[in-house]
Every structure is written in C-alpha cells, then in structure tokens.
C-alpha cells in the first residue's frame, strides 16, 4: 500500500527461477565426462552417459576387414538397426575403435571375430568397465534392449 511517509521504502526484486533443457543437458554432459589413466599410462577419455540416454546405443565392430567378418557384422547391424541407434566401424585397430566409441559415449561395442563364424556368438564390451562377455547372436537383441531401457534406468534411480 502506498504511503507518503519517507521512512517507507519499497525494494523491488525479481526472482527468476528456471530450469531448461540446456542446463540439464550441460549437467549430464559435465557429470559424464571422465578421463581415466590406464595401467600402461595412457589416458582414456570416456563419456559415461547412462545407456538409456546415450544417443548411440551400440557399435558393431568386425575384428578385421577380411575373412567374412565384415559381412557377418553387417548382418548383425541389419538385425539391430531398426530398434537401436547403431554405428558400424571397421577403420583402424579394434583398440582404437573401442577408444573412439568410449569418447562419444557408446555404452556397448559388439565385436565380431573369427569364433563368431563358428559358434554364432559375439563379444559385448561394456564401456564403463571395459569387461567383455560372449553372448549368442540370438540373445543379443534382448540383452541390449534390457540394458538401454529407460524403464530400467528409472528403476535404478528410484531405488
């Protein structure tokens, strides 16, 4: 209420609260960036985005560019590409390809090797732990679906 008394002073303040997608995005990106020193002294850059939030869910990597491995890798790519955002890479050594995928935040690398042609299994490499697991190609879709599920991420957060 207005007053003519000189002792009454109005302080005008504006409080702006906002949370936009850009701030959340920056927070997730900053919290996910990691540089690790490996046993051999090299530095490994990893973008540890939660698998459900990673733009590229998996990379399919033939071990070498010969012996029928690229063809088998492309077959696996065709099987997965309509359900997951995938990348195919056959350039450079397998170690360099793993590093490239780590740096862009790809949570899973599917490696097609010579044993794949014999036993119809591939190796899944997990970005965060660098551990590898041999799985049947027939089960690959279900395994990846479970690991990149937003529902499973939210369950983890709520626990």
Annotate the PLM regions.
Residues 1-6, 10:
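Single conserved hydrophobic/aromatic residue that forms the stacking wall/gate
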Residues 77-144:
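C-terminal structured "cap/appendage" subdomains that terminate the fold
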Residues 11-30:
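Conserved phosphate/anionic-ligand binding catalytic regions in large, soluble enzymes, centered on
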Residues 41-100:
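Generic long, charged, amphipathic alpha-helical segments
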Residues 27-35, 82, 146:
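Short, well-ordered loop/turn and helix-capping segments at boundaries between secondary-structure elements
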Residues 19, 28-29, 60-65, 88-90, ...:
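Active-site proximal loops enriched in glycine and acidic residues that flank catalytic Cys/His/Asp
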Residues 150-159:
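Acidic, low-complexity intrinsically disordered tails
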């Amino acid at each position: 209420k207005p007053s003519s008394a000189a002792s009454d002073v109005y302080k005008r303040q504006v409080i702006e609260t906002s949370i936009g997608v850009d701030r959340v995005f920056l927070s997730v990106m900053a919290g996910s960036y990691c540089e690790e020193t490996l046993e051999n002294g090299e530095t490994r850059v990893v973008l540890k985005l939660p698998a459900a939030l990673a733009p590229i869910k998996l990379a399919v990597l033939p071990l070498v560019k010969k012996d029928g491995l690229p063809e088998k890798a492309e077959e696996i790519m065709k099987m997965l590409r309509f359900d997951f955002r995938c990348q195919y890479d056959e350039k450079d050594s397998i170690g360099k390809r793993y590093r490239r995928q780590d740096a862009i935040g790809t949570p899973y690398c599917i490696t097609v090797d010579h044993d794949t042609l014999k036993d119809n299994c591939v190796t899944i490499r997990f970005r965060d732990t660098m551990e590898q697991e041999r799985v049947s190609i027939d089960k690959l879709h279900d395994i990846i679906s479970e690991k990149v599920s937003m529902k499973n991420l939210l369950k983890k957060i709520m626990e």
